[in-house]
Amino acid sequence: MLQLNSFAEISTLADRLPVADEAARAAALARQNSLTKPVGSLGRLEELALHWAAWRATERPTITKAQALCFAGNHGVCAQGVNVFPQEVTHLMVKNFEMGGAAINQLCRAAGADLQVISLDLDRPTQDFTQGPAMTEAETVAALNVGAGAVDVTADALIIGEMGIGNSTIAAALAAAIYGGTAKDFVGPGTGSDAAGIARKIAAIDKGLALHGGLGGMETLAALGGREIAAMCGAVLGARAARIPVILDGFISTAAVSTLFKVDPRLLDHCVVGHTSAEPGHQKVLTTMGKRALLQMEMRLGEGTGAALALGVVRAALECHNGMVTYAEAGITA
């Protein structure tokens, strides 16, 4: 299990964590090109098969076990009126997850993923980032380790998601800090903010950016992030250590791991993006990261729902890769 101790240690992780197995990728490509279909005709399904082959280090990868992790946290910046719901809703939604009543429960069941919901100090929100850093380095590293430690190293795929009132504000702040621009470039309605609510979000983010500009990736995570945001980053790193491909969800999870992208883009090489969120900042982030989402469903719920839906696409890709026969096996010659 990956154990992290400091931001300085994370800065060197890309040189020490496993990398894609290019021999397995090449073997999988050779198989793809011999199957009973025109080369490339399954489009991105073929790309997904090669991605899983490279990270699972086998020509014919399967998903025997898929894990979904949904991290929950609360945020001090909610004191600035950035959300229409009180923070108690985070508690209530966690209970809903645990009782099986949320969208993520249904989509994980449909996709064949085992869901775990992990709360991080819900009764102790982070600090208000308009007044100072949201977290200390020690608090951030602790949350990173919660995420890394939650990864089931026997899984073949990992979905990450989140729940936290106010965390669309956190995501917009992180995206603006990492990629540049203003709050207006990344702020959306979140859980239903009206024009006045959006104005409060923009004002809070602009104040946070003025206070915490010019920082490195992990320092930005501490200054503007949250515990569940850091835990998602930790899970991504823990999965990398175990060679488990990750399916990111929408805007919030992608903005979260942008802090890792800032540290070293290679830290996200094992990740695919499940869907393009309807939140306006998401496509801007994806374009800058150079990643294409698998689905466009106009979703913006979070929780890991878009990633869970995309897991079905990955499973379909691997079924084709492993179940189709080659031209030789079918007795077909050119």
UniProtKB/Swiss-Prot annotation:
Active site: E303
GO BP terms, alphabetized: cobalamin biosynthetic process
One Pfam match: DBI_PRT
GO MF term list: nicotinate-nucleotide-dimethylbenzimidazole phosphoribosyltransferase activity
InterPro entries attached to this UniProt entry: Nict_dMeBzImd_PRibTrfase (IPR003200), Nict_dMeBzImd_PRibTrfase_bact (IPR017846), Nict_dMeBzImd_PRibTrfase_N (IPR023195), Nict_dMeBzImd_PRibTrfase_sf (IPR036087)
Keywords for this protein: Cobalamin biosynthesis, Glycosyltransferase, Transferase
Keyword match Transferase: yes
Broad EC category: transferase
Keyword set includes Glycosyltransferase: yes
Pathway assigned to this chain's UniProt record: Nucleoside biosynthesis; alpha-ribazole biosynthesis; alpha-ribazole from 5,6-dimethylbenzimidazole: step 1/2
EC number(s) on file: 2.4.2.21
Annotated catalysed reactions: 5,6-dimethylbenzimidazole + nicotinate beta-D-ribonucleotide = alpha-ribazole 5'-phosphate + nicotinate + H(+)
UniProt family annotation: Belongs to the CobT family.
Annotated function: Catalyzes the synthesis of alpha-ribazole-5'-phosphate from nicotinate mononucleotide (NAMN) and 5,6-dimethylbenzimidazole (DMB).
PANTHER family: NICOTINATE-NUCLEOTIDE--DIMETHYLBENZIMIDAZOLE PHOSPHORIBOSYLTRANSFERASE
Designated name of the protein: Nicotinate-nucleotide--dimethylbenzimidazole phosphoribosyltransferase
Species for this entry: Rhodobacter capsulatus (strain ATCC BAA-309 / NBRC 16581 / SB1003)
Designated gene of the protein: cobT
